[in-house]
Amino acid sequence: MEVESTALASDDSSFVVGTAWSVRRFDRQGDSRWNSESESTIAEVLITPDDRLVLSVDSRGVAQWRRFSDGEVLLNFFPHVDGKRWVAWTPSGYYDASPDGEALIGWHINRGASRAPDFFPIEMFRDHFRRPGVVARILD
């Protein structure tokens, strides 16, 4: 396991590491508490001062907030390099976005090795999944 970044809990009882393909939490003795997979190398990890959340940023620029207690991903956030567009989404698909930010994500569905995958932009499902209020409450 090659560690890219580390963060220490405020009470020094445990720490979090970012690696290629995961964020992991260990106790003071070095025993694993949880392992949360990622789709990319984790470049940075931070623990909130109240030890409630872990923030990670991966090599693609996607930020993820995880629950400190179990590593569950609560919210994803992608700010585009143009500084104007962004999108935030939950693992269940609810999202909020800046104007034109909906174009940044969608669902990629594989259809087998001999067929091209399908891509469904998130905006196709706006009426069901665009829920700014749900996204805003996630980190409360």
Report residues per predicted region.
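Eukaryotic protein-protein interaction scaffolds centered on beta-propeller repeats
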Residues: M1-E4, W21, R33, R60-D140
